[in-house]
Amino acid sequence: EQWLFDGFIFLESQDVDRPDSGAYSYMTGVLRDAGVSAGKEQWQELIDYYFTKGNCADALEQAVKEATARLGKAPCKRRVIIMIPDPIIHRHYIDTTTTTTYWGELGGRRLDFNSNEDRVAACRWYIDQVRARFAQGDYKYIDLAGFYWIREIAAQPHDTEYSYHLTRSDIMLPHIADYLHKLDYTFSWIPYYGSRGYDVWQQFGFDQVYLQPNYYWKPQNDMDEV
């Protein structure tokens, strides 16, 4: 046995396996025909899930601890990257007649996701909550290295065929990146092959970007293209 992976990512695109039969989306583009955008309550539930004893962070901590007993101390702590939910503008992402004030309150004020500043504020709140919970865990074998942007496309105003008006991520991402960098965290992204924005990833503030080859979805593709 030898040490191999030194980084792990926690992410969820949707929450549909719920006792209340609800269906919530953490990113624009999923649950098109059913379900609604996740609000503050669901974002908090996601954080709670990641840090519940026996789940995600704790499970990885225990796994590395067990491996350390067999292999000796790893060269460094295993790094954890945690996703940031997409602050979807509308309650139902594709229906622009649905409310933009569904998410919840911060500082005694109901946020309006039609506002870029409010969407960034929600992401900053989430980042701070994750940081606090990770610190409370007092982990010996894992380290919070950064955050991951879950939405795999970053359309710009000229990308009209990609429903730019439903996301406007290009306006928001640099502000999230600035906040993370001030806290000394990395900002990662994994766009799919042919995604919009992948070629200008630096202007969004990402540090690490990995392009998906899409072979999983299109196995008929020529391997030269992949």
Label each PLM-derived region with a short phrase.
Residues 1-226:
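Glycan-processing catalytic domains of CAZymes
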